[in-house]
């Protein structure tokens, strides 16, 4: 991105999905870090910490204790599902930005300030420009206001919702002119399905991914509280808000045939709020017992770090293969400046294949990381006569990509 015109094109170019703020964030990363993956990872970690902080503030705004709010933020951040993908996958940036803008919008509307409706509309639009699930944010924010006001004026709340409606309209118009996916022309695995069996399976899967960890934490906090002590009005209201958030943020994705744990990142904010309300009750009625339970949970999470790490192998192994492969190709092309093409021969029996590492983006990866003048082809076997003096051949050996000499002898490095 070198000019304002490039920025404008981000909002008008069809790349399938319509997530221009995510693309803009990557452009900023490119300007700061060039192609150093560690910089992109640092941005994702920063967004995760920012989201945890916003969840703490949101829990405080709905009147939870500091301890309950901190408990909610921890439950969300240490969920087994989704958070790891949001950090490790490039595409995970979408979920992190959605959560960031959605929570900021919720904080603003619940503040009750005079300027809140307009700012909430801007933040809701930013969330929509980050991920499609946010189209339900305008009605969700209206419902949250109705649930949170002790003496709510429904007419005033509905009257002040026009900036949210305007944000949705602007988003739909901008998306429509970009040519992005619609319900009609999206790939089949992204088109909504109303097959009852498929929807019920999705509901079960997403209840697990978005609520299991929060449920376990809630049970532990409930048992820590003094028995017979009821929830306060604020705690009950927070539970209603959390359930509403959870349902709204899943309302679209349960109808999408393809499942992804990334879809659980935003809804699990709601289940974390429920856990925070239960924890607030425990702290209020039995602070010493709650402190022991919370300390035990911290120790358990620390002991489970190897489990968290092992669950990420399937996410990082393709990235490791891509990094090693590009480094090998870059070295070989540097040694052969006359090379104009590379052919990569994959191992069909390998648990992680080059296709897993690059997908359809191998030419783009070679263009960015190696040389824009070099063509790239991925194959399962070399075709006799398919290479020439300007083509470099590579194949897999021992799980790694290695160059092949013209006499078929591998280079040893």
Predicted regions and their residues:
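Polytopic membrane enzymes that build or remodel cell-surface glycoconjugates and lipids
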Residues: 1-413
